[in-house]
Design a protein with these regions (language model features):
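An acidic-aromatic substrate-binding cleft motif
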Residues: 189-228
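Polysaccharide-binding surfaces and accessory modules of carbohydrate-active proteins
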Residues: 1-141, 157
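Short Pro-Gly-centered flexible turn/kink motifs
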Residues: 161-180
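Short acidic, Pro/Gly- and aromatic-enriched capping/linker segments at domain boundaries
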Residues: 147-164
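A generic secondary-structure signal marking the coil-to-beta-strand transition
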Residues: 124, 167, 208-210
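Short, Lys/Arg- and Gly-enriched loop/turn segments at beta-strand edges
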Residues: 177-189
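Conserved, mostly hydrophobic/aromatic
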Residues: 42, 166, 212
């Protein structure tokens, strides 16, 4: 998950309670103002005396009351990852996701909504990036009033999580970012967040040692002699 040191960030917690069932949903918003980053996650807490099941939970959701957007996603396969697909947001539902147990190279667990004239260097765009490598689901919906909704979270297919009384389900985090300076600036926002607030360890901001990739040259049958 995204972390911060000292006073780099603030967190807003909003607790929603269903008085009929005693179930609480806690919405957590983390703010990194210097990076134009907001993080969002959800906790589902069973405050009742009975066992419940969570069948669907989205970590982040945004509503756009007006605007005409394009949806940008990234698909791929072996040796051909991260291919950009840009399509108009149409009425109804457009969805990406994975049920492979991993997010995989088929679909990257992130989405961008961009204004029609947005390029690399100018224009408004919104990003959602899931800090999770398992099954996921991203969806964009446009209704009869031309309002757009953007959601990202755990894949709902085959998802059924039991919560005993007093237990809490912690949904993975989503990174949100916006800029009016084009896709390049949006990428920089996300890169800076990942580099400084997700990566850890000695080499987080230092030049890393050289890593020798022996796969194509020797596969798994390598020795000091074959590597030399």
């Amino acid at each position: 998950a995204v972390y911060a040191d000292n006073d780099e960030a603030q967190t807003l917690e909003i607790v929603l309670e269903d008085p009929a069932t005693g179930v609480e949903a806690m919405l957590l918003y983390g703010v990194l103002p210097e990076l134009d980053i907001i993080t969002r996650s959800v906790y589902i807490r069973n405050q009742s005396s009975e066992k419940i099941y969570v069948n669907k939970v989205m970590s982040a959701e945004l509503d756009f009351l007006y605007g005409d957007y394009d949806l940008l996603t990234f698909y791929g396969r072996h040796a051909m990852e991260r291919n950009l697909q840009r399509v108009p947001v149409a009425h109804g539902s457009q969805m990406i996701g994975s049920v492979r147990g991993t997010s995989s190279h088929q679909y990257n667990p992130m989405m961008i909504l961009a204004e029609k004239d947005t390029t690399e260097d100018h224009g408004g765009c919104y990003a959602m990036s899931f800090v999770y490598s398992g099954n996921f689901q991203g969806e964009v919906l446009k209704d009869q009033y031309n309002q757009t909704r953007m959601l990202l979270g755990v894949q709902e297919e085959c998802f059924r999580y039991p919560l005993e009384a007093g237990e809490t389900f912690y949904a993975p985090e989503v990174i949100l970012s916006y800029t009016d300076q084009g896709m390049n600036r949006l990428s920089q926002n996300l890169h800076s967040c990942i580099r400084h607030h997700i990566c850890r360890g000695k080499y987080k901001t230092e030049v890393r040692p050289v890593l020798v990739n022996s796969w194509e040259a020797a596969y798994f049958d390598f020795t000091g002699e074959t590597l030399y």
